[in-house]
Amino acid sequence: MSDNIPLFDSLAHPTPDGNWLGSKAAGRNSFGQYLREAEEANCRWALCVGLGGVGGYDEGSYAELVRATSPHFYPVAYFDFGGDLGERELERRFRRMKDSGYVGIKIHPRIAQVQLDHPRLVPAIQLAAEAGLAVVLCTHFYSAGAEAYRNNLTALSRLLGELGDPKLMLAHAGTVRLLEVMEIARPYPRVLLDLSETLCKYEGSSLDLDIQFMFRKFDRRICVGSDSPEYSILDVRRRFEEFARGLDPEKAVNVAHRNLRNFLGGVTSPAG
């Protein structure tokens, strides 16, 4: 049964003060609440991802809070494009993050208000990788504003090409452009597609067929997550069970946790 396969939540956002964007989860987005739901969902591992200015996030203390909650939760730092983005300063920032216990950084173009053609984006990704940090790039590109159109799949394809052999996790995998992002990522074997948000938000739409296809034909390149508190890891468990029904068990394990654990290298605990 696929419900015996533990999950690795690729994108969780528990916050120090339990709050979130707007009033959606005011006071209810705590580490304790997330841990309880993760245990109920048989979710053994999670990337806990901070966002600048949200829920009391502080880079200096977030990693310690994550590690104190569970040895199987791994902190990811928010990368702010403000301030000095010179090579030496980036190296210093990433070294500090690594020394603080972070396993990666999250680049969120909408929140950071940057475009994928930002002149320091490629160096930032490369230097983070050199420091041993995984890079998570948000690919939910839809927002208001005169510059919003500049973040699109053409820009994403160009970015991957400029990076050459990028090691990236593409958060949300392009949402409604899922299959197109799959083909954009296909030539880059170290690019992992994260189905958080997309898996739950578009339930009942034509994307269900695309997700089913990817579980069966692209199972070595995808992972699942909640984007909590937008969606619960319990919702992810239910959706995972739907798509894993009748699936080769090895493919189900790939999607559930193996791909993401391989992507992160040796930082995660054994499957057990």
Residue ranges and their predicted role:
Residues 26-37, 84-97, 178:
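Short, acidic/polar
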Residues 11, 38, 97, 105, ...:
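Conserved, mostly hydrophobic/aromatic
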Residues 15-18, 53-56, 82-85, 112, ...:
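Active-site environment of divalent metal-dependent phosphoester hydrolases
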Residues 12, 32-55, 73-80, 102-104, ...:
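Divalent metal-dependent hydrolysis catalytic cores, especially in the metallo-beta-lactamase
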Residues 7-17, 110, 136-138, 170-173:
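Histidine-centered catalytic micro-motifs
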Residues 7-10, 47-50, 76-78, 106, ...:
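Active-site neighborhood of phospho(di)ester-bond hydrolases with catalytic His/Asp-centered motifs
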Residues 1-10, 14, 23-45, 219-221, ...:
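Mid-to-C-terminal alpha-helical segments outside catalytic/metal-binding sites
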Residues 104, 118-223:
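Catalytic pocket-lining loop regions of alpha/beta-barrel enzymes
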